Regions:
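Bacterial N-terminal signal peptides
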Residues: 10-23
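Sec/Tat signal peptide C-region and signal peptidase I cleavage site
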Residues: 25-31
Length: 351
C-alpha cells in the first residue's frame, strides 16, 4: 500500500485520481507493457503480459546446448549455435519459444505485440521465428550492445505473430528492436515499450501535458515511460510491481520483474497473486542435467527452485496444444508437431 501511494504521488494529481477508476474501461486483447526502472546501481525490468489466456511454464534453459532453428518457410536458412548462457524464460508456446526471459549475464529480452510490424523480406541470412529470436539472444549475448552488433546478420521469419522487443542489461542499457516497413529498426535508449512503435509512442507521449489514465497502448506507454524516468521511492522491486498495477488491464495474465543486477526473477499471475522468485545464481546451469520447468501458477509464493522438475515432452506438448487451439488452423501445417518435438532434438555439447 505504501508503494502504491508513493507511485500516486509521483504522478500528476489528475492521473492519480482517474487511474483508480479506469479499471472499468475496455482494453485491447494485446496490451503488454515492458519498462526499466533504475536508481543508482539498482535496476529492474517489469513486464505485464496481457493476453486472452494465462497458462504457461517457467523454464530453466541450460548453457552448452547445440541448437538449429527450425525452418518456417521454404527457403529459410537455419541459424546454428551453442548456448553460451543459461536463462530463465516464460513460455506459453513451448520450450525454446519464450515470450521473454533473462540470462545469467543479466540480459533481459521481452516480447510485445505490434500490429504494424512488417518483417524483412526473405534473403540469404539465417532466420529464426518471432519467439525463438528471443531465446537466441538470451543464449548468445551478455549485453544490449552485443545484440545490436549481431542484429544485422539475422532476420525474423514469423510463424504468426507481429511483435517487437525490448532488451535491457545489467548496466542499464536498453534498446527497442522492431521491424517497420520491412526494415529492422533498433532504438538504443528505449526504456519502455507497449503496442505501438517506439517512435510513434514517444511522439504521442511528448504531446501529453497530463499523464493519461486510459488503457490504450499509447496511454500505457506514457505512464510507463514517465515512471521509468522518475521511479517511485522505496524498494525498486516493489515499485516495479506497483507500476505494473498502473499499466494492467482486465486481461493481464502475468506480472514479471527481473533484477538483472542480482540475477533474480520475481513473478505473479492472474490465477495466483502470490509473488514467486527464482535466483539464477543458485540454479544448475550445466546441460549435463535436463532443462527444468515449473508451472507459472505454482502455489504458494516464495522461492520456487525446489519445485522445478526435469523437462518432459508430454508437459511441453500439452501446453502448446492448449495455447495454439484458437489459431491452429491459421498456422503452417505441422507447426504444433514441430514446436512440441523440437526440444527433443537438442543435444548437450559442452556440459
Amino acid at each position: 500500500m505504501i508503494i502504491l501511494i508513493t507511485v500516486l504521488r509521483a504522478l500528476p494529481l489528475a492521473f492519480a485520481v482517474t487511474a483508480l477508476v479506469a479499471g472499468a474501461a475496455s482494453r485491447p486483447a494485446a496490451a503488454c507493457t515492458t519498462f526499466m526502472l533504475e536508481r543508482g546501481s539498482e535496476r529492474v525490468v517489469g513486464k505485464s503480459y496481457d493476453w486472452y489466456m494465462g497458462q504457461g511454464l517457467v523454464v530453466v534453459n541450460k548453457r552448452g546446448i547445440a541448437k538449429q532453428s527450425p525452418p518456417v518457410k521454404p527457403g529459410d536458412r537455419a541459424a546454428r549455435w551453442v548456448s553460451r548462457h543459461a536463462s530463465v524464460t516464460f513460455n506459453q508456446y513451448g520450450r525454446e519459444f519464450p515470450t521473454g526471459g533473462m540470462n545469467d549475464a543479466g540480459l533481459v529480452v521481452e516480447v510485445m505485440w505490434l500490429d504494424s510490424s512488417i518483417y524483412e523480406r526473405p534473403d540469404a541470412r539465417p532466420s529464426l521465428n518471432e519467439l525463438q529470436w528471443t531465446q537466441y539472444q538470451l543464449d548468445n549475448f551478455t549485453s544490449v550492445a552485443e545484440m545490436i552488433a549481431a542484429a544485422p546478420g539475422l532476420r525474423v521469419s514469423p510463424v504468426y505473430a507481429r511483435v517487437h522487443y525490448l532488451a535491457c542489461d545489467r548496466s542499464g542499457a536498453c534498446a527497442a528492436f522492431e521491424n517497420i516497413g520491412g526494415k529492422q529498426i533498433i532504438t538504443p535508449g528505449a526504456r519502455a515499450l507497449t503496442n505501438n512503435s517506439y517512435a510513434d509512442s514517444v511522439a504521442w507521449a511528448a504531446m501529453q501535458k497530463v499523464v493519461p489514465a486510459g488503457p490504450s497502448s499509447l496511454e500505457r506507454f506514457t505512464r510507463a515511460a514517465r515512471l521509468a524516468a522518475a521511479p517511485p521511492a522505496g524498494d525498486l522491486m516493489a515499485g516495479a510491481f506497483a507500476v505494473l498495477d498502473f499499466v494492467r488491464s482486465p486481461r493481464s495474465q502475468w506480472n514479471i520483474v527481473y533484477d538483472p543486477v542480482h540475477l533474480r526473477v520475481s513473478f505473479r499471475t492472474r490465477a495466483n497473486r502470490e509473488i514467486k522468485t527464482l535466483d539464477l545464481g543458485k540454479l544448475d546451469a550445466s546441460c549435463a542435467e535436463s532443462a527444468a520447468l515449473v508451472d507459472i501458477d505454482t502455489n504458494p509464493g516464495g522461492d520456487v527452485a525446489s519445485r522445478l522438475r526435469p523437462y518432459d515432452v508430454a508437459t511441453n506438448r500439452s501446453l502448446i496444444e492448449r495455447s495454439l487451439q484458437r489459431i491452429r488452423k491459421r498456422l503452417p501445417a505441422g507447426a504444433v508437431e514441430l514446436m512440441a518435438g523440437y526440444p527433443s532434438a537438442l543435444a548437450c555439447q559442452a556440459p
